[in-house]
Amino acid sequence: MAQHAVYFPDAFLTQMREAMPSTLSFDEFISACQRPLRRSIRINTLKISVADFLALIAPYGWSLTPIPWCHEGFWIERDDEEALPLGSTAEHLSGLFYIQEASSMLPVAALFADDNHPQRVMDMAAAPGSKTTQIAARMGNRGAILANEFSASRVKVLHANISRCGIANTALTHFDGRVFGAALPEMFDAILLDAPCSGEGVVRKDPDALKNWSPESNLDIAATQRELLDSAFHALRPGGTLVYSTCTLNRQENEAVCLWLKETYADAVEFLPLGDLFPDADRALTPEGFLHVFPQIYDCEGFFVARLRKMSSLPAMPAPGYKVGAFPFTSLKGREALNVTQAANAVGLLWDENLHLWQREKEVWLFPAEIESLIGKVRFSRLGIKLAESHNKGYRWQHEATIALACPTHAHAFELSVQEAEEWYRGRDIYPQTPPAADDVLVTFQHQPLGLAKRIGARIKNSYPRELVRDGKLFTGNS
């Protein structure tokens, strides 16, 4: 594999020599950093099993190598990448997989390391959504995830990825993560803090990642990380699990931040060793039980992961000063809720007791039940999924609800051919040889829901959102 020129500040190299264990070769570290990063994907098990996905793509000639710490993760090699980018394949568009760097699958693997089943989880720095969607898959779309993102421009991308993957159990917020310890004390069973960092581990993806690097900036970043970790630890319930991770390599932003928490709260903090997380995990194990992944160890990005348990309650932080404002939704119950549920079921949209119906004017929404106790405590950017808009003749079902809730074996399901599916993704109406009998059609491809549409005579009217429409080649092996 060809090498590329990476910019290394001299002070960074000195710091890495000091941080790297004697069992690792510094020359191999430099060599690994200069190799392009292997591509990797994670199969979305909310939509398809690993076995069924592998069978589906078997004719494509993709070479998949299992990632040892993630059962549904694979390194991928393709011969047709230039002709058909991975992100434009039909399987990606329908949410069957997520393009995710292998190392970044580690934090969620650690969060669920003891086969725990948290009901309320926070992803404190969630965009673009790789870890939020991975958490949702591990939870089976049940319980609730509070996915927070401080950067306003990245919240939209976060929602788009959550929607594409068919996730229904998520609430989005847009806050500085330092507010949660005070705003939501001891409200979460598990928390992932994939902290903002200096990004020293990503040079294989971005050779210029260290252009603005300095030892002083590392210390400034570590100060912010301590405040975020403190907030996360206060938001965690006693007995809960917290994973702290970064994509950087220096000790100040990694081990030192975790040790600061231990020094601050003593016996309330327990480090949970990760040496048994996967075969060969001990190659990256620190004396504290953390994983400090230098890129040459597993041929991936540099990464750091620590797993903590909160052993006892902490004194509350000062109450937050912001105002939440009036909540604009009302709960739907009784006959109203039954009418919506029956109408949705009739077109193939199904949900269970984990989701509750709420209304705002003509909009009907589904909120995860586990998030309802947080209403009034924080302001949400988006909560649950928008199910429908009501009008005089019934309901206009929303695309994100179809992707998350539709049953592909429903009587109104209509499976498209490859050519018809390409037309659908391009935003064009479908003219099938044998039109469906029903007026309301659940359009599917590869037995995955693509949308709800109306049959008008012999034509299926395209309902694919305009902002998602694609051009060009979309299907492997189909010219």
Swiss-Prot record:
Family designation: Belongs to the class I-like SAM-binding methyltransferase superfamily. RsmB/NOP family.
Compartments, record wording: Cytoplasm
Catalytic residues of the enzyme: C247
Gene Ontology terms describing biological process: rRNA base methylation
Pfam family, one: Methyltranf_PUA
Record GO terms (molecular function): RNA binding; rRNA (cytosine-C5-)-methyltransferase activity
Protein task: Specifically methylates the cytosine at position 1407 (m5C1407) of 16S rRNA.
Enzyme nomenclature, EC number: 2.1.1.178
Alphabetic keyword roster: Cytoplasm, Methyltransferase, RNA-binding, rRNA processing, S-adenosyl-L-methionine, Transferase
Origin species: Salmonella typhi
Residues engaged in binding S-adenosyl-L-methionine: A125, A126, A127, P128, G129, S130, K131, E149, D176, D194
UniProt-listed CDD domains: AdoMet_MTases
UniProt-recorded name of the protein: Ribosomal RNA small subunit methyltransferase F
InterPro entries membership: Methyltr_RsmF_N, MeTrfase_RsmB-F_NOP2_cat, MeTrfase_RsmB-F_NOP2_dom, Nol1_Nop2_Fmu_2, Nop2p, RCMT, rRNA_ssu_MeTfrase_F, RsmB/NOL1/NOP2-like_CS
Upper taxonomic lineage: Bacteria, Pseudomonadati, Pseudomonadota, Gammaproteobacteria, Enterobacterales
SUPFAM superfamilies: S-adenosyl-L-methionine-dependent methyltransferases
Cellular component aspect of the GO annotation: cytoplasm
Disulfide bridge partners, by residue number: none
Broad class of where this protein is predominantly found: cytoplasm
Reactions catalysed according to its record: cytidine(1407) in 16S rRNA + S-adenosyl-L-methionine = 5-methylcytidine(1407) in 16S rRNA + S-adenosyl-L-homocysteine + H(+)
